[in-house]
Amino acid sequence: MPNDATLPTAEAANPMRRATHNPLPRGNDADTLALEIVEKLTYSLGKTTGVARMYDWMDATCLAVRDRIIDHWISSTQKVNKDQSKRVCYLSMEFLIGRLLRDAINNLGLAEPVKQALARYGVELDLVELLEPDAALGNGGLGRLAACFMESMASTAFSYTHLRAHETRGNL
């Protein structure tokens, strides 16, 4: 892995972070992603690039990608509310979603920039993705159908809500 002294630090990603607590405008280029991943690594996980393990890189990458998903989520929710659009709500007792990091990166169009951002620190995106556990919620056909249904809606930028019933001691 490269020497910490030659790589951007979390302070470089956001020098006013402590003073303003305002998020950076999120760019989708490799430079911005690299800085934000390091910021997550430092301020969310308490690690430096020199001591971070592969799981730390996975967590930091997930957090940086999640921020972009939240930006899209807030924007689309505001648009749906403003336009008073209809919504699709899907209720499922089981839900086989699989691994989400690769899907999220692809749906945001960030596959190459994230790969380049991690490569700057000697980290391979393919190895990071393998660390994500499969959620394995549910046990079969309907769960897989729910996941496919939602994935197709996400890939086509269709606004939807997923509701999941939790059973506790026989009560929903």
Regions found by a protein language model. Give the residues of each.
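Extended, charge-enriched "interface" segments that sit outside catalytic cores
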Residues: 2-83, 87-97, 101-108
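A conserved hydrophobic secondary-structure block that centers on an alpha-helix together
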Residues: 143, 148-151
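Anion (oxyanion) recognition and catalysis
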Residues: 154
